[in-house]
Amino acid sequence: MTTTRTLFKGGIILTLDADIPNLSVGDVLVHGDRIAAVGPELQADDALVIDAAGHIVMPGLVDAHHHMWLGVMRRMMPNVDDLFDYIDVVAEKLGKHYRPLDMYLSTRLTALASLDAGITTIIDACHNSRSPEHTDAALDALKESGIRALHMVGAAMDKEASSAHLPADLERLSRSWNTSDSLVHVGLF
């Protein structure tokens, strides 16, 4: 199996590392999913070369708290004054109608928008894990997007929701997703 190497050439390098200086013009060599080298005039004959001149090259950002299942509802209530009014509408009135496909689409939309904004790692605080199928759909969306994620499984917030499936489901999910080679992991919210 060959691992892809990518060389970003001539970019403005922000290392975010006290031991590696920023460069006004420099290169970054990525091997697979890891930064292999940072410096001026790097060479890698077998690498895909991307001209980064005039662009900032830096490690991906981390979003430590996001409710990705709400992605399709963003900007729905921009002028809400009371958080509890928002929760009432989202959790009590809308969230309970989500199907697994809705979880997939919303989570995928949010993951791709995050990647587009430079966020490569995210903690997804999901409080709409209505069933194992809902959780599987959200996890599939995260995996397919390519983002690194910790999906925090949480009970749905509406009065009719049941969380009885969560203890057994969390064991199943942990066995399936919490492996050393997975970009997506599972925890409890």
PLM ranges: what are they?
Residues 1-44, 56:
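N-terminal metal-binding scaffold of metallo-dependent hydrolase/deaminase domains
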Residues 2-4, 46-47, 53, 117-120, ...:
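Short coil/turn connectors at secondary-structure junctions
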Residues 11, 28, 33, 54, ...:
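Divalent metal-coordination and catalytic microenvironments
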Residues 26-27, 48, 186:
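Extracytoplasmic/periplasmic beta-strand context in beta-sandwich domains
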Residues 72-103, 146, 159, 182:
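Active-site gating loops and adjacent loop-to-helix segments of metal-dependent hydrolytic enzymes
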Residues 92-129:
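Hydrophobic alpha-helical hairpins/lids featuring a short glycine-rich hinge
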Residues 128, 133-189:
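Metal-coordinating catalytic core of metallo-dependent amide/deamination hydrolases
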